[in-house]
Amino acid sequence: MEKQIQVTLPDGTVKTFPAGTTPFQVAESISPRLAQAAVVARIQTTQPAAATVTAGSEADSKTASEAAMYSAADPGAPRLVDLSTPLEEDVQLALLTEKDPEALKVLRHSAAHLMATAVLELFPETKLGHGPATDAGFFYDFYRPTPFTPEDLKLIEGRMAEIAQRNDKFVREFIPREEGLAEFKAGDDFMKVHFIERFTQPGEAISLYRNGNFVDFCRGPHVPSTNRIKAFKVTNLAGAYWLGDEKNPQLQRLYGTAFFSKKDLDEHFARLEEIAKRDHRVLGKQLDLFSIQEIAGAGLIFWHPKGAMIRKIMEDWMREECIRRGYDLVYTPHVMRVQLWKTSGHEGFYSQNMFTPMELDDAEYRLKPMNCPGHILIYKSQPRSYRDLPVRYAELGNVYRYERSGTMHGLLRVRGFTQDDAHIFCTPEQIEDEVVACIDFAQSVLTTFGFMDFQVELSTWDPNDRKNYAGSDDKWNLAISSLESALTRKGIAYKTIAGEAAFYGPKIDIKLVDVLGRLWQLSTVQFDFNLPARFELEYVGEDGERHQPVMVHRALYGSVERFFGVLIEHYAGAFPLWLAPVQIGLVPISERHLAYAEKVQQQLEAAGFRVELDRRNEKMNAKIRDFTLQKFPYVLIMGDKEAEAGAVSVRTRGKGDQGSLPLDEFIGRATTLIDTKSGDL
């Protein structure tokens, strides 16, 4: 009797099919329209397949997580499969269409294969590296002696369009490892040979995908055929070393992107244009906010007066809030002896990210990469009782980390930066309330600076990988339950990510969503079971015994530099009135109005406004234009009528001419906007 399997659909419906039925056939049994719309399937089964295979991939091979991409998936975990995959066991099945985000990633993976197919047809001497999907599209690494030119990229894109129309099916096959090695060795595909040899074992079957004459070592899945790839573009070319090692040959990395429709593709590039306009590196120079000076070194920020003013506002607000919320402000040294970093573990586990030691008075010192050990030393400077806890230390501390030159990016990734670090030392009973307070503080930071949307992730441990975590099971369970309870008390939806916690404790990451819908990781609340043990922290409990305090790290800006970079891009440099480095530009119509303009300047500055007066002997429109380009919130114009009436003619950023107002009335309105930290003008 033919074996039957049960397929459970997302709505709970259970259907029975012969073993070997494909997801596409399941879709056809439901509706021909669904079968045509389906792109890929998600299945979950607790029964392993009859044969064990090792799936290929297009990942680099530098880390364990990358290596895992080459191994067979856990048969009990949800996984994506081709619509042509035979179903041999009972499964839960979801058919994904173009509306599902996971389907887009599959499309882009297939587009990477399409691009590699085109490259080999046009440039047969090329050797293949790997080609994954990314959040923004896809790329593929190639090795060839001759560099690709801009004209080549156009040719490749054109050939991709031709291949897409051929409607070649993406076909998966499993072949013996030795047969696959022989096939790729025959073509001198040294990178594919490396992947197979490193991530598969002798005697195993390996997974290949073919479309037309193209073949790749790959785990998939893919769209059914090339004609599903309709809207794509080859975007740019970059260099990448084979296996990320500068001693290896340099590869040429072609980037592209793909969508299910031309409309989505066009919207994507319109969004990229808007992102380019908001680039904080461009606006930082245009608005004279900051610079990076080559003679001083990469990743080191020079804050110009206007940028420094915003930084001061950010730091002053943060310090005032910390004091209001019960934190004690502290300052710790920029350099400390290596012995401290050995005790903390940084010297052994983090030294590659630290600047090299300097020798002073027969002792080695290092620039601090983190503020935590300094705060711990202050805590240890006197005996502590349970009555003293919680102790909350806050510092806007400068830290220094060695970042590779290729990883730095404007303000977003630098070598020297300022962290709004705080460390809370408390009893186990106080944990939940302290975490609630940290979350409340984080929400206040984001909303005050105009970020009304954010996402929260809770990173927990993998209890099956116990040896890789510091702290007892009881401590981990208490910390995780406290974080969960705190988020529940605040009514915040969150996503739990098992196995993503640092070795020293679970954490909450708060990712803000900017005006373009981009996610930015900034605020973190992090438990630490490692440092209290390393530094032998103690307090005397109510029972008279010595106990180890719970230690919580929290950073809300993350770093002042990164937060400022995100602010620039979020507002496109048009900062809200309370945050703008210059709030008001003053334009006297002619030289005879300068005296009145100076009087207005004095009154505004006395009221606390940041003002710039254009004294140049230029035409009024030129002055207005210059202030507008600098994105000042207000431009006030003064002529005969304004001088006689004690008024100003108001131009508001983004709204234009607002007419004449008595100066006192303008001051009152603007003061209210500043006091409420309003984003309106």
UniProtKB/Swiss-Prot annotation:
Gene3D superfamilies in the cross-refs: 3.10.20.30, 3.30.54.20, Anticodon-binding domain, Bira Bifunctional Protein, Domain 2, Threonyl-trna Synthetase, Chain A, domain 2
Ranges of residues in domain TGS: 3-97
InterPro entries listed in its UniProt record: aa-tRNA-synt_IIb, aa-tRNA-synth_II, aa-tRNA-synth_II/BPL/LPL, Anticodon-bd, Anticodon-bd_dom_sf, Beta-grasp_dom_sf, TGS, TGS-like
GO terms (BP aspect): threonyl-tRNA aminoacylation
Reaction equation(s) it catalyzes: tRNA(Thr) + L-threonine + ATP = L-threonyl-tRNA(Thr) + AMP + diphosphate + H(+)
Entry GO MF terms: ATP binding; metal ion binding; threonine-tRNA ligase activity; tRNA binding
Region feature Catalytic, mapped onto this chain: 279-576
Alphabetized UniProt keyword annotations: Aminoacyl-tRNA synthetase, ATP-binding, Cytoplasm, Ligase, Metal-binding, Nucleotide-binding, Protein biosynthesis, RNA-binding, tRNA-binding, Zinc
Amino acids binding Zn(2+): C372, H423, H553
EC number: 6.1.1.3
Compartments (UniProt record): Cytoplasm
Family matches, as CDD domains: TGS_ThrRS, ThrRS_anticodon, ThrRS_core
UniProt-listed PROSITE patterns: AA_TRNA_LIGASE_II (PS50862), TGS (PS51880)
One Gene Ontology cellular component annotation held by this UniProt entry: cytoplasm
Assembly, per entry: Homodimer.
PANTHER family: THREONINE--TRNA LIGASE, CHLOROPLASTIC_MITOCHONDRIAL 2 (PTHR11451:SF44), THREONINE-TRNA LIGASE (PTHR11451)
Protein purpose: Catalyzes the attachment of threonine to tRNA(Thr) in a two-step reaction: L-threonine is first activated by ATP to form Thr-AMP and then transferred to the acceptor end of tRNA(Thr). Also edits incorrectly charged L-seryl-tRNA(Thr).
Protein name: Threonine--tRNA ligase
Organism for this UniProt entry: Acidobacterium capsulatum (strain ATCC 51196 / DSM 11244 / BCRC 80197 / JCM 7670 / NBRC 15755 / NCIMB 13165 / 161)
Lineage: Bacteria, Pseudomonadati, Acidobacteriota, Terriglobia, Terriglobales
